[in-house]
């Protein structure tokens, strides 16, 4: 699914797995989309997948819109109780109060905890990178592997996480 926008916030989601009822949503700003979809895994199980790229806070502006979007998604996930994965450039660092509140609101796990920082931005400055790109998951998953991949031409490095869904 693709939703191109000229403002830099267009989104695309490509999957080898079946996407179920994918939708582009505008939770807090008509110019900032997010994606929600079901994904049918090879096992036949279905999970919820959220793709987010909230607007970064600008100098002399607060981050209220970004914060609201993250907390709304977190609360939605917690309310469903279903296996869920959230991924994207959250324009925030892992140790910020906003990111911690997002994880609390959704009862989400950050797979980088205990594994490293996985710094992804800016790709062109290896010594000055920090983590802006995320994969969060609910308690239904365990982490098999997580790593940052080499530069691809983006200003962010790719982040890959291999998660296993607990089938019990």
Residue ranges of model-derived segments:
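Soluble catalytic domains of enzymes that build or remodel membrane lipids, polysaccharides, and related
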Residues: 1-168
